[in-house]
Amino acid sequence: MDKPYLRKLSTPTLENPVFVQGLPGFGNVGRIAAHLLIKFFDAKPFAELYSPSFPDYVSINAVGVCHLPRYEFYYVPMEKNNLVIMTGEIQPSFEDVVAHYQVCDEVIDFVETLGCHFIITMGGIPITEEKAQVYIAATSPRLAAEFMEKGAVIYSKGRIVGGTGLTLALAKERKMEGVSLLGTTTGFRADREAGFLVFKFLMKALGKEIKEGLGENNAPEE
């Protein structure tokens, strides 16, 4: 393997899909939020992305079967906009800038073929505050204002590291719209509380009620 490789498991019928990305990073906030979405909607896997830029190890599942590091794509049929959810257990090394651009471009290439024109990335930001917050970065002032009305705070305190920010910015260059939802975290451990906060905010934005019993204690710890 000398370049990213996309494997399709099935070909779902999607109408006006919205792309939602949640990857590991500060506090694993994005990945935790994505896993909660997948659980809530009982989302079905339909594609996997592999890359030689991912770490040189394999993961072992509960029955002892190994697989390469990968990004996983899931789909959710909905009345208004279908969801395409992507998550994974890794990102390219932060020192490998070219790899980040290549992988994020590959992701955007794929979701464009699915008909996605709006993207939502989720992640964590290392800000210590007494009150947990969801911050917003967007591709336009209009979108930033819309999500502020939903309760988010404009993020103007620095950079968004890794795929959480890069996917959003590269999508903007292709005339796609989108936002990044950022949960505050210390970043020293898997922050299930911050992940659940971002998940809950997104569910509210989608107009969905959270099932009873689905809380931060149901979020993955890794």
Predicted features and spans:
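N-terminal short beta-loop-beta anion/metal-coordinating cradle
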Residues: M1-I90
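Long, Lys/Arg- and hydrophobic-enriched amphipathic alpha-helices
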Residues: P24, I32-H35, G187-E222
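Conserved active-site and cofactor/substrate-binding residues in soluble primary-metabolism enzymes
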Residues: N28-I32, V98-Q102, E106, G162, ...
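Hydrophobic/aromatic beta-strand patches that form the interior of the parallel beta-sheet core
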Residues: A47, V84-M86, F118-I120, E177-L182
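A generic structural motif
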Residues: I90-F94, T185-G187
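Internal, conserved structured core segments that host functional sites
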Residues: F94-R142
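Secondary-structure boundary elements
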Residues: D105-I119, K172-E177, K204-I210
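Catalytic cores of processing enzymes, dominated by hydrolases/peptidases
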Residues: P126-A205
